[in-house]
């Protein structure tokens, strides 16, 4: 069933009336969410209906690539608007291996909070100080059981994140706000791999299993880069899946779709809360991910060094006042959410962007204007997952 958010339509047709009012921003981020499961990008599994509804009223960037296919480096880069080699947050390890973002580095939160915005963050952090400027509320895990799939703290924390974001957006402040609802799922897929290590015969769902992707098989293993050849030795989840049969990979896809549907319901609740008050009319919504997931392509699960599109090509969606609805995804423009989110939101809010930030503002494209400044290429980096293993190759 298609959901219509009542104030969204009003927002899109009331740009002139809102022109002098600073827009609010709601950023919804889902860990591991790849384009390969989002309906707005042509997928037909029906896993992301609330996200698809937002996308249908705004702008969808197809060629959006993250700066690192790993959570902490990607997030530290995203909220600071710099690449991992610039932040020196290059793995998922904590201090002293990875330094915190220095206090003198402008972040998305500091720029907005210093310019009259209330900046709030709910949910997953994993940021090494890059969320400075945001008021963070730690989510309370709410355990529950699932009859078909294993659930862990990722899913439990998302319940608390959803409740916190809904409570805030149902009673928003009078001043302009920038709010982040930062969900863990579909990250619970990592726990699914651990719970199903090796060949297993149980079926997590009844009925027909999802088909394997067209690029499931690795046809020329000896000629692919060494880091990818040895990924089963350097990545725990790939080791756990290394002896799976084809049906086991179909189980994996079914589980990934399940966790995506779980978080989509929570996204729906957050959006309904936003549009339940007049503030929703003046709020730009951004939907994105810190990185993607292998989705059984090239026999890969979760994320790691490979840089395949499944891991690095993420949803990047904007909708709201001042955003000109486009009938088709923007395919001609290369974007780096890691770098481009900060200058784009600052531009839309009328906030000056520090000159040292390497990203570009996508505001012209969002407004239906000519995009003069573009990326000639995109960059994604890899160092190590936890610095325990040196990955071979470049």
Describe each model-derived feature in a short phrase.
Residues 40-45, 58-82, 121-131, 182-187, ...:
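Short, solvent-exposed turn/loop segments enriched in Gly/Ser/Thr/Pro and often Arg
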Residues 32-45, 171-175, 183-335, 348-355:
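Active-site-proximal cap/lid insertion segments
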Residues 172, 291-297, 339-342, 347-394:
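C-terminal cap/loop subdomain of S1 sulfatases and analogous C-terminal strand-loop tails that border
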Residues 2-9:
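Sec-dependent signal peptide recognition
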Residues 9-18:
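Hydrophobic h-region of N-terminal signal peptides that target proteins for export
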Residues 77-179, 183-206, 375, 380-382:
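Catalytic-site neighborhoods of secreted/periplasmic enzymes
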Residues 21-26, 57-62, 115-119, 173-181, ...:
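Loop/turn elements at helix/coil->beta-strand transitions in domains of secreted/extracellular proteins
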Residues 20-59:
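Active-site-proximal N-terminal segment of extracellular/periplasmic enzymes that hydrolyze or transfer
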